[in-house]
Swiss-Prot record:
Entry EC no(s): 7.1.1.2
GO molecular function: NADH dehydrogenase (ubiquinone) activity
Catalytic activity reported: a ubiquinone + NADH + 5 H(+)(in) = a ubiquinol + NAD(+) + 4 H(+)(out)
Record's protein name: NADH-ubiquinone oxidoreductase chain 2
Gene for this chain: MT-ND2
GO cellular component: mitochondrial inner membrane
An individual GO BP term: mitochondrial electron transport, NADH to ubiquinone
Broad EC category: translocase
Residue intervals passing through the bilayer: 3-23, 25-45, 66-86, 98-118, 149-171, 178-197, 202-219, 240-260, 274-294, 319-339
Species annotation: Salmo salar
Length: 349
């Protein structure tokens, strides 16, 4: 793609997200979401491949449906209540419709079916943008409307997302689909605690973005798209293979890695709020996700394929452009757990 065109599209992505962040009126927020969608579609379709075009079409249809639902809900609220402000969303029909629309934009269960299929048809870098940056604007709106939404609906969607995210990834061999189901599971954890501790939701979103970015970048550097290619990565770059395994375990939430922190704090907060059953179910579904991460690590580190290479394994990474950001983001994805006491102190301020 032409660098000037790419710069304009990426600037439009940033503009759309910032516009949604800064808006208090539903029409402005809707406009920001639409700018976001229209900016990423050419980036998704830059590969002239039928799979990429199919993924782009599916993404466009789902996002257009969600945008229409948001417009319908805000208009309904303005008609019945007389308010266009995001914080003044009060009618039950409008709040439920907006929640479903934002869930469709994010890929929350039970409206998650588009996300694995779309992510499977994209390059890893475009999939990274879709899995991280494109979640910010809908989440900003969801945090603002969360106090008016029925808490039972949020808990049900959160638990269903963690279950679907864990269950759906079990039988996958494509890494992009596994990361898509991982995204669904993490979003479920965020929605689960959204009404009780929004600061924990933001912390989880921040750590999710760091860990997912690290996972996508390591897979991009490894040039791995399936479990089979991931299993041969040890012979190509042992250091990167070890880092990839640690990042995947961090995504699974194993201590002492960074991914354990948000799960630990969310389970603690749910128990404090008198929801031990929800906390237990969430912890049980986390085991499903952990299983397929362990499966990937087993394929990478414990089953080294026979090879005929006589050359010494290259311990140094070849891609100098990606090495520095990859190093920084991987360190953050692995080593933030010791900061948990400081984080809990900040959350109570």
């Amino acid at each position: 793609m032409n660098p000037y065109v790419l710069t304009i599209l990426l600037s439009s992505l940033g503009l759309g997200t910032i516009l949604t962040f800064a808006s208090s009126h539903w029409l402005l927020a809707w406009m920001g979401l639409e700018i976001n969608t229209l900016a990423i579609i050419p980036i998704m379709a830059q590969q002239s491949h039928p799979r990429a075009i199919e993924a782009t079409t599916k993404y466009f249809l789902t996002q257009a449906t969600a945008a229409a639902m948001i417009l319908f809900a805000s208009t309904t609220n303005a008609w019945l209540v007389g308010e266009w402000e995001i914080h003044q969303l009060s009618h039950p029909l409008a709040t439920t419709t907006v929640m479903l629309a934002l869930a469709l934009k994010l890929g929350l269960a039970p409206v998650h079916f588009w996300l694995p299929e779309v992510l499977q048809g994209l390059e890893l870098t475009t999939g990274l943008i879709l899995s991280t940056w494109q979640k910010l604007a809908p989440f900003a709106l969801m945090i603002q409307v969360a106090p008016t939404i029925n808490s039972s609906l949020l808990i049900a969607m959160g638990l269903l997302s963690t279950l679907v995210g864990g269950w759906g990834g079990l039988n996958q061999t494509q890494l992009r689909k596994i990361l898509a189901y991982s995204s669904i599971a993490h979003l479920g954890w965020m929605v689960l605690i959204l009404q009780y501790a929004p600061s924990l939701t933001l912390l989880s979103l921040f750590l999710y973005i760091i860990m997912t970015s690290s996972a996508f970048l390591t897979l991009k550097t490894n040039n791995s798209l399936t479990i089979n290619t991931l299993a041969t990565s040890w012979t190509k770059s042992p250091t990167l293979a070890a880092l990839t395994a640690l990042v995947l375990l961090s995504l699974g939430g194993l201590p002492p890695l960074s991914g354990f922190m948000p799960k630990w704090l969310i389970l603690q907060e749910l128990t404090k709020q008198g929801l031990p059953l929800s906390a237990t179910l969430a912890a049980m579904t986390a085991l499903l996700s952990l299983y397929f991460y362990l499966r990937l690590c087993y394929a990478m580190t414990l089953t080294i394929y026979p090879n005929t290479l006589t050359a010494t394994a290259p311990w140094r990474l070849n891609f100098t452009l990606i090495t520095l950001p990859l190093s920084i983001i991987t360190i953050l994805a692995l080593g933030l757990l010791p900061l948990t006491p400081a984080v809990t102190t900040l959350l109570t301020l």
